[in-house]
C-alpha cells in the first residue's frame, strides 16, 4: 500500500517536471543545497506559527484540566464579558424620556464620584510619595554632608600630610576611642557642664581647655594663650554675633588684642634669646625693655650695619632701638630713645609724643598728612629700613611696602600690617596709605592662602595668621581638617560659641565653612552643629557619656524642621549605642524609673525619652520603642506597639528563648504592672492587647495538646461562633476588632476546627454506649460538634475579611469529614 502511494507520487512528480520543461517562456531556477535548506526553514517556521496557538491551547487544557477546570468554558465566559456598559458613552435620550434622563443622571453622578475619588486618591498617593521622598532625601543628604569633612576645593585636596602613623594607637573593640588629649578635653567639658547644670556661675572655658595644653606641646600652649588673648574683648550689645563682630569697636579691640599678643610674644622671644647668650648680650643696667632691647641688639646687630642713619644711642642705631622697643610693645622705652636722640630726629619727637598719647594710636589728620608728605619726599627710598618701618607704622602709610628687611618673619609682618590698619575714613587718605581690616583679611585668606604658608609643615602658623586677623571660623575649619589637630579645633570653636563670638551657618546643610548672601565680603560662617557631630562620631558608640556632654552645647540649636538639636542628637546617640538604660534610665520592677545620665541635663526627661522612642519606632525598632514609651509613661503607645509585636507571634509554637516567649513575658510583665497600678490606655488598644494575650494562652494550650482547656478559652473569648444562633452576632462584632486580631483569624478558625474534629474523632473512638454515657448523649454530642463546625464554616464565609483559599479548603475538608 505504501509502495503504491510513493510510486504514484513519483509518477506525478515526473509528469510535473516534464510539463514544466515544456514551457519555454519560464526560466529555469536552480538552487544549491544551502538555499533549499533556508527555504525549508522558512516554510517550517510558518507552519509552526500557525500551529503554536493550537499547541498552547492544548497544553493549557491539559494543565488546567488536571485540576478540574474547563478551559473552553472559561474562554466562553471571558468572551461573553463586555465593558461596553461601563466605559461606553451614555446613549442620548429624548427630552420626554424621564426614566432615561434619570438613569443617565444617576450614571453620570456615579461616574463623576468615581472619577473624583480616583483623582483624589492618586493625588494623595503622589503627595505622600513626594513627601516621603523629600524626607528620605533630606536624611540621605545630611548623612552625605556629615561624611564630608570639608567641601569645595578642600574636598579635593589630596595633599599628603607629613604626620606620624597612629596605627599602633587603634583601640581594641569595647575600649574608649578617645586618646589621652581628647579624654583630657572631655573631662574639662564635663566639669564645665556640671557647673552650668548646677546653676553656678559660668566658668571660664578657655582656662579649662588651656589646662589641657600643659599635657601637650608648646604649640598648643601658645595657641590657647592666643585664643585667650583674642577672646578677651567686650562685645557690643547686638541681636546676633554678626552684628557684634561687625561693629567698629569690636574689630578695633580684636586688632588691639592681636597686637598685644604679638608684642608680648616677641618680648618673650627677646628674653629667651638674651638669656641664652648672656656673654654676647652683656645684659646690665636698670631692668626694663630698653636694656633688654640693647642686649638683644648686641646679638642681632653685633657690628654697625651700612645705611643706618641719624646716629646712635649708647652704641646702637637710633631707629633700630626705637623699632624694637615698639616691637616689644613698650612705647615708653621707645620714647626714652627718642628723647636721647631728639636733636638728630627733627619733628619726629613731636609726632611720636602725639602718637603715644592718642587713645587709639592714631595721629590727627593734619599731623598724619604732614608726616606722610615728609615720608614721600624724603624717606620712601631711604637706606635705613628701621626708620622707614617706624614712619610707616606711626603714619600708617605706604601699605604696599612689606618692609621685608625688618619684618622677615610672618609674626613681624602681621604686627606691622595690623599697626597700619585703620577704621575711620576721613577721605584724606590715598589708596596706597589706607589699609582696612577687611582688605588685610582678604589678602591673607584668598590672595595668599594655604599654599603660601606651607600649612602641612607649619599648620599652627597659618592658624595663627587667620586667628589674629579675627578670621576665627576659617582658622577653625582649617585646623579641623587635620586629624591630629581636630580636637583642638573643636574646643576652640566651643569657646567661641560659648562667648557668642562664633558666626554659625544658618542651615545645617551648609558646608563646614561658608559665606552667606548679605554677609560682609570677608566674613565666613562655620557649620558648628556639623563640626560637633563629625567630632563626636568617632567615639559616640564607645563613649556615649562623653558624646552627651558635647551634645549639651546644642541645647538651644534648631534644625531646618525646627527640632531641638540636643533632642535629635541624643535620640540618634541612644539608637546607635543601644545604651538605653545608661543614658535614659531604667524601669524598676515596681514601675519606678531609675535615673539615667540624661537626668543631669534636664528635670523633665519625658520629651527626650518620647523623642528617642519615636525615632526607634520610625526605624522599625518596635520592641525598644515600647520599652522607651513605657519609661516615659506613655501607656497608649506601649500597648499599640505591643499589639504590633504580639500579632505575628500569636499562633506560633512557644519554645524557650524564642521570639514569642520573650515578647510574651514582656507583655505579661506590662499587663501585671498596669493592672496592679491601675494604668489604662485607650479602650480599643487596651482590649486588643488583653485579647492578644488570651489568644496566646489559647494557642499555647492548643499546641500543648490540652484541647479541652483551649476550647474553654476560645468559648469564653466569644471571638468565633460555636452555634448557629451566635453567627450573626459574631460577624457584627468582628467588624470592631483591630487588624492585629483579624490577621490571626485564619489560624484561630483552623485551630478551633481542629479541636472540634479531634473531639469528634475521640467521640467516635469511644464504645457505642455505656451506663454512664448512653447512646442518646453520644448522638447529642455528635450533633452539637457538627453544628459547631457548620457555624464556623458559615462565619468564615460571612465575615468581611479575605481568608486564604487554603484555610477555607481545610475548614471545609474537616467539616465534611465530620458528616
Swiss-Prot record:
Pfam family, one: Nic96
Membrane protein topology class: Peripheral membrane protein
Keywords carried by this UniProt record: Membrane, mRNA transport, Nuclear pore complex, Nucleus, Phosphoprotein, Protein transport, Translocation, Transport
Entries under InterPro entries matching the protein: Nucleoporin_int_Nup93/Nic96 (IPR007231)
GO CC terms: centrosome; nuclear envelope; nuclear membrane; nuclear periphery; nuclear pore
Single GO MF annotation: structural constituent of nuclear pore
Recorded superkingdom: Eukaryota
Sites of Phosphothreonine modification: 49
Modified residues (Phosphoserine): 52, 66, 72, 75, 80, 430, 767
Chief localisation class: nucleus
One Gene Ontology biological process: positive regulation of SMAD protein signal transduction
Location(s) in or outside the cell: Nucleus membrane; Nucleus, Nuclear pore complex; Nucleus envelope
Summary of subunit composition and partner proteins: Part of the nuclear pore complex (NPC). Component of the p62 complex, a complex composed of NUP62 and NUP54. Forms a complex with NUP35, NUP155, NUP205 and lamin B; the interaction with NUP35 is direct. Does not interact with TPR. Interacts with SMAD4 and IPO7; translocates SMAD4 to the nucleus through the NPC upon BMP7 stimulation resulting in activation of SMAD4 signaling.
PANTHER family hit by this protein: NUCLEAR PORE COMPLEX PROTEIN NUP93, NUCLEAR PORE COMPLEX PROTEIN NUP93 NUCLEOPORIN NUP93 DEAD EYE PROTEIN
Role this protein plays: Plays a role in the nuclear pore complex (NPC) assembly and/or maintenance. May anchor nucleoporins, but not NUP153 and TPR, to the NPC. During renal development, regulates podocyte migration and proliferation through SMAD4 signaling.
Family (UniProt): Belongs to the nucleoporin interacting component (NIC) family.
Name used for this protein in its record: Nuclear pore complex protein Nup93
Amino acid at each position: 500500500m505504501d509502495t503504491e502511494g510513493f510510486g504514484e507520487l513519483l509518477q506525478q512528480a515526473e509528469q510535473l517536471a516534464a510539463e514544466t520543461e515544456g514551457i519555454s517562456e519560464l526560466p529555469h531556477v536552480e538552487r544549491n543545497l544551502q538555499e533549499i535548506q533556508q527555504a525549508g526553514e522558512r516554510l517550517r517556521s510558518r507552519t509552526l506559527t500557525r500551529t503554536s496557538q493550537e499547541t498552547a491551547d492544548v497544553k493549557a487544557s491539559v494543565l488546567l484540566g488536571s485540576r478540574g477546570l474547563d478551559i473552553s468554558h472559561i474562554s466562553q465566559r471571558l468572551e461573553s464579558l463586555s465593558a461596553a456598559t461601563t466605559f461606553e458613552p451614555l446613549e442620548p435620550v429624548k427630552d420626554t424620556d424621564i426614566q432615561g434622563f434619570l438613569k443617565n443622571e444617576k450614571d453620570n453622578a456615579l461616574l463623576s464620584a468615581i472619577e473624583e475619588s480616583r483623582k483624589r486618591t492618586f493625588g494623595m498617593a503622589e503627595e505622600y510619595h513626594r513627601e516621603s521622598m523629600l524626607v528620605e532625601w533630606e536624611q540621605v543628604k545630611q548623612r552625605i554632608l556629615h561624611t564630608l569633612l570639608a567641601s569645595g576645593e578642600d574636598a579635593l585636596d589630596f595633599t599628603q600630610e607629613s604626620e606620624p602613623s597612629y596605627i599602633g594607637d587603634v583601640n581594641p573593640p569595647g575600649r574608649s576611642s578617645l586618646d589621652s588629649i581628647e579624654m583630657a578635653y572631655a573631662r574639662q567639658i564635663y566639669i564645665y557642664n556640671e557647673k552650668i547644670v548646677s546653676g553656678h556661675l559660668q566658668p571660664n572655658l578657655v582656662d579649662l581647655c588651656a589646662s589641657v595644653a600643659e599635657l601637650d606641646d608648646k604649640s598648643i600652649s601658645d595657641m590657647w594663650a592666643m585664643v585667650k588673648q583674642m577672646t578677651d574683648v567686650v562685645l557690643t550689645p547686638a541681636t546676633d554675633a554678626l552684628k557684634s563682630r561687625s561693629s567698629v569697636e569690636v574689630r578695633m579691640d580684636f586688632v588691639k588684642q592681636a597686637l598685644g599678643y604679638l608684642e608680648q610674644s616677641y618680648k618673650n622671644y627677646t628674653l629667651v634669646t638674651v638669656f641664652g647668650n648672656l656673654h654676647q648680650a652683656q645684659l646690665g643696667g636698670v631692668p626694663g625693655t630698653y636694656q633688654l632691647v640693647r642686649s638683644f641688639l648686641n646679638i642681632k646687630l653685633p657690628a654697625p650695619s651700612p645705611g643706618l642713619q641719624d646716629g646712635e644711642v649708647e652704641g646702637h642705631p637710633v631707629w633700630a632701638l626705637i623699632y624694637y622697643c615698639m616691637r616689644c610693645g613698650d612705647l615708653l622705652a621707645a620714647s626714652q630713645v627718642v628723647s636721647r636722640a631728639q636733636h638728630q630726629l627733627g619733628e619726629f619727637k613731636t609726632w611720636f609724643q602725639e602718637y603715644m598719647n592718642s587713645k587709639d594710636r592714631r595721629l590727627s589728620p593734619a599731623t598724619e598728612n604732614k608726616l606722610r608728605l615728609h615720608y614721600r619726599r624724603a624717606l620712601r627710598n631711604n637706606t635705613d629700613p628701621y626708620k622707614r618701618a617706624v614712619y610707616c607704622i606711626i603714619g600708617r602709610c605706604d601699605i604696599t611696602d612689606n618692609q621685608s628687611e625688618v619684618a622677615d618673619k610672618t609674626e613681624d609682618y602681621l604686627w606691622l600690617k595690623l599697626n597700619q590698619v585703620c577704621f575711620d575714613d576721613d577721605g584724606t587718605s590715598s589708596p596706597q596709605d589706607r589699609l582696612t581690616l577687611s582688605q588685610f583679611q582678604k589678602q591673607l585668606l584668598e590672595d595668599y592662602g594655604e599654599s603660601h604658608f606651607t600649612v602641612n609643615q607649619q599648620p599652627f602658623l597659618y592658624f595663627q595668621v587667620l586667628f589674629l586677623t579675627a578670621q576665627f571660623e576659617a582658622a577653625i575649619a582649617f585646623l579641623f581638617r587635620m586629624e591630629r589637630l581636630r580636637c583642638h579645633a573643636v574646643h576652640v570653636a566651643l569657646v567661641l560659641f560659648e562667648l557668642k563670638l562664633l558666626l554659625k551657618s544658618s542651615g545645617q546643610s551648609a558646608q563646614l565653612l561658608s559665606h552667606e548672601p548679605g554677609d560682609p565680603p570677608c566674613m565666613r560662617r562655620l557649620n558648628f552643629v556639623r563640626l560637633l557631630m563629625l567630632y563626636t562620631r568617632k567615639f559616640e558608640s564607645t563613649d556615649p557619656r562623653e558624646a552627651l556632654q558635647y551634645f549639651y552645647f546644642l541645647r538651644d540649636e534648631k534644625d531646618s524642621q525646627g527640632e531641638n538639636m540636643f533632642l535629635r542628637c541624643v535620640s540618634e546617640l541612644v539608637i546607635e549605642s543601644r545604651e538605653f538604660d545608661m543614658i535614659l534610665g531604667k524601669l524598676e520592677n515596681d514601675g519606678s524609673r531609675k535615673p539615667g545620665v540624661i537626668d543631669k541635663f534636664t528635670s523633665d526627661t519625658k520629651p527626650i525619652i518620647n523623642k528617642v522612642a519615636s525615632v526607634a519606632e520610625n526605624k522599625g525598632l518596635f520592641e525598644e520603642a515600647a520599652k522607651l514609651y513605657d519609661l516615659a509613661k506613655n501607656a497608649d503607645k506601649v500597648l499599640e506597639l505591643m499589639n504590633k509585636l504580639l500579632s505575628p507571634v500569636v499562633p506560633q509554637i512557644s519554645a524557650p528563648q524564642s521570639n514569642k516567649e520573650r515578647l510574651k513575658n514582656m507583655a505579661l510583665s506590662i499587663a501585671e504592672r498596669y493592672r496592679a497600678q491601675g494604668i489604662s490606655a485607650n479602650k480599643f488598644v487596651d482590649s486588643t492587647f488583653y485579647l492578644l494575650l488570651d489568644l496566646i494562652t489559647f494557642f499555647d494550650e492548643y499546641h500543648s495538646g490540652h484541647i479541652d482547656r483551649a476550647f474553654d478559652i476560645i468559648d469564653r473569648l466569644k471571638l468565633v461562633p460555636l452555634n448557629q444562633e451566635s453567627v450573626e452576632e459574631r460577624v457584627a462584632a468582628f467588624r470592631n476588632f483591630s487588624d492585629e486580631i483579624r490577621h490571626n483569624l485564619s489560624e484561630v478558625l483552623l485551630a478551633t476546627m481542629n479541636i472540634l474534629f479531634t473531639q469528634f474523632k475521640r467521640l467516635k473512638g469511644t464504645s457505642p454506649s455505656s451506663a454512664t454515657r448512653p447512646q442518646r448523649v453520644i448522638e447529642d454530642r455528635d450533633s452539637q460538634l457538627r453544628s459547631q463546625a457548620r457555624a464556623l464554616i458559615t462565619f468564615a464565609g460571612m465575615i468581611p475579611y479575605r481568608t486564604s483559599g487554603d484555610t477555607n479548603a481545610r475548614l471545609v475538608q474537616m467539616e465534611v469529614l465530620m458528616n
